[in-house]
Amino acid sequence: MKAATHLNGLTSHRTLKRIDSYGWLEAEDQVAQEEPLEIKFRIGSDKEKSAGIVMRTPVHDDWLAVGFLYSEGILHDRRWINGIEGVSIEGKAQDNIVTVNIDPRNGSFDPDYRERFVNSSCGICGKSTINGIFLRMGKIKRDNIKIDPGVIVSLPVIMKGMQQLFSKTGGIHAAALFSADGKPIVTAEDIGRHNAVDKVVGFSLIEGIDTSTLILQVSGRAGFEIVEKAAIAGIPVICSVSAPSSLAIEVCESLGLTLICFVRGSSFNVYTHAERIMI
């Protein structure tokens, strides 16, 4: 099970004024660090190009860069990765820039590709066309996955136990990949929910993990951008502790993803493709 373990530089202490029934108090709080990251890519010996600037929590930037490039359609296969530059052992990009080198025999990109700015609350802001958003999402292959309901209700509990930054700040999202029998594979935290998903997808690509039988658990709502990233990565099941959006439901129904939301306590709602749940 992989998860963030280095907390240095990921939070900062702030002095504040707190008011309660007794009046004003001086207090301290830990807040989540948010910094920009420029994600670049280079094909062979060509000049590097900027894929975008994301606002993120500065940890596992290599995972984030690979996952982002994959969801943007610049990377299509882990074998295209020919090295990642600018990331320390702790997973933080030096100077907030990370460059992914792409094998020139396999790399290709849209010559009209423009640099994009992605803030920590929006995973699709700045994309140039609506058609481009849907282009890379394909139908999930038919499978025989069967998931016990007991596994589903256990996932948020397991993930929360791995959320070190959330326990310190209360202001961090998380995403995790689990096997169909509930074994944790990777957890990532980020101030942006879509960044957290990019991180676990990037990890799976770097490590060569087959995602076609896995479950994606997320800490926030299940909106379109989460479904988009799961569909591109070929993940068949999405679980959320919160609500879905109408478009997320429609896309999951169309593409064959199982969408499970409001996973709380011993209950949950299955919005699409309930055939993967044991009854």
Curated annotation (Swiss-Prot):
Assigned keywords, A-Z: Cytoplasm, Molybdenum cofactor biosynthesis
Cellular component, GO, one term: cytoplasm
Gene3D superfamilies, A to Z: 3.10.20.10, Cytidine Deaminase, domain 2 (3.40.140.10)
Superkingdom classification of source: Archaea
Major localisation: cytoplasm
Active site, per annotation: C122 (cysteine persulfide intermediate)
GO BP term, pick one: Mo-molybdopterin cofactor biosynthetic process
Disulfide bonds: none
Sequence similarity: Belongs to the FdhD family.
Annotated protein name in UniProt: Sulfur carrier protein FdhD
Organism: Thermoplasma volcanium (strain ATCC 51530 / DSM 4299 / JCM 9571 / NBRC 15438 / GSS1)
Gene (name only): fdhD
